[in-house]
């Protein structure tokens, strides 16, 4: 095929606090030649997720930091436009970890590149409810949360990509599910559309009182994604034997020095009877991904699990859109449309 140009966004400098435009740079380069066993993927949708903020920092973490001048990492969905692989044909739809760019050359042996079917569910959902956020919810609750029917589950960031799925799976498992979200619109969506039993607005004047009213039997499982004041309120109402899977704590991600932040580990550790808690990674359960993928896709296709997307357009504006994750401007899964087919 004729030589094409590829636009990408790289990390230009490490953010101090909230990332700004100058921390990123748009670059244009030639697309590498596709070699035997490789495919060229045209990226159609880009997923923006909170974990990316941690990768921008040089601080020690569960994953290596993004190098300066390296393409920002991300899960994406696209279509194969050139193939020198016996496993992929032109026109195949795939998910991959291309990062913030328009085209990606993938090796056929890359386990993070795999076929998906946009006839079953919309292609963009493979980046959300049927993708990494959905799998995080599935394993975070079923494996880390160890749910028992009749227990009370509290879900932070309940209208978000992960939390919304956690709560809906919780209802399937017979739990009393209470969400925590920001604002009346999101709370109404969580309760009326997603089917949570209750939803507490974390902006409420009396968060402790509102949470206690929603959880009259105390809290058995807390799915942690936020940290801060929300976690402080939840921690006062744990039952003995409670579990708290920690997916993240977005309230601290833009701190100038996260080592000085009061994290869920500090809050839980100070309790007389701390809940069972740990930071988990979805890749801890990689061997079971097929199980989660099958279940989530079927539930979405059958209308048993609902989802919300904020769909925006333009690779060049990805840094701006990324900031929405921390201001609450997005509603549900934040996806950037990169190109038409």
Which residues make up each language-model segment?
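Short, glycine/polar-rich helix-capping loops at beta-to-alpha or helix-loop-helix junctions
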Residues: 101-102, 182-192, 260-267
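NAD(P)H dinucleotide-binding glycine-rich loop of Rossmann-like/cofactor-binding domains
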Residues: 72-79, 87-157, 304
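Glycine-rich phosphate-binding loop and adjacent beta-alpha segment
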Residues: 229-305, 339-341
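Glycine-rich beta-strand-centered segment in the early N-terminal region that forms part
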Residues: 30-48, 56-100
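Mid-domain Rossmann-like dinucleotide-binding core that forms the NAD(H)/NADP(H) cofactor-binding site
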Residues: 127-205
């Amino acid at each position: 095929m004729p030589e094409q140009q590829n636009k990408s966004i790289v990390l230009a400098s490490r953010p101090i606090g909230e990332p700004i435009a100058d921390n990123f740079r748009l670059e244009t380069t030639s697309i590498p030649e596709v070699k035997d066993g490789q495919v060229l993927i045209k990226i159609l949708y880009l997923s923006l997720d909170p974990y990316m903020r941690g990768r921008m920092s040089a601080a020690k973490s569960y994953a290596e930091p993004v190098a300066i001048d390296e393409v920002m990492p991300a899960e994406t969905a696209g279509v194969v436009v050139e193939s020198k692989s016996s496993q992929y044909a032109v026109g195949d739809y795939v998910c991959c970890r291309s990062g913030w760019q328009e085209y990606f050359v993938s090796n056929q042996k890359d386990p993070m590149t795999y076929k998906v079917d946009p006839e079953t569910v919309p292609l963009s959902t493979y980046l959300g409810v049927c993708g990494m956020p959905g799998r995080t919810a599935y394993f975070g609750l079923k494996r880390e949360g160890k749910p028992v029917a009749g227990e009370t589950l509290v879900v932070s960031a309940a209208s978000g990509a992960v939390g919304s799925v956690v709560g809906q799976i919780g209802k399937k498992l017979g739990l009393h599910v209470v969400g925590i979200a920001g604002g009346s619109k999101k709370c109404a969506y969580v309760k009326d559309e997603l089917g949570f039993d209750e939803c507490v607005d974390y902006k409420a004047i009396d968060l402790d009182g509102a949470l206690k009213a929603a959880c009259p039997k105390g809290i058995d499982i807390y799915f942690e994604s936020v940290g801060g004041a929300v976690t402080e309120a939840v921690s006062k109402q744990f039952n003995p034997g409670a579990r708290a899977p920690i997916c993240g704590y977005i309230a601290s991600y833009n701190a100038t020095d996260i080592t000085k932040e009061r994290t869920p580990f500090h809050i839980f550790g100070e309790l007389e009877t701390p809940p069972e808690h740990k930071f988990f990674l979805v890749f801890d359960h990689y061997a079971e991904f097929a199980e989660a993928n099958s279940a989530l896709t079927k539930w979405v296709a059958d209308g048993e699990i609902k989802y919300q997307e904020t769909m925006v357009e333009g690779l060049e504006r990805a840094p701006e859109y990324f900031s929405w994750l921390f201001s609450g401007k997005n509603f549900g899964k934040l996806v950037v449309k990169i190109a038409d087919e």
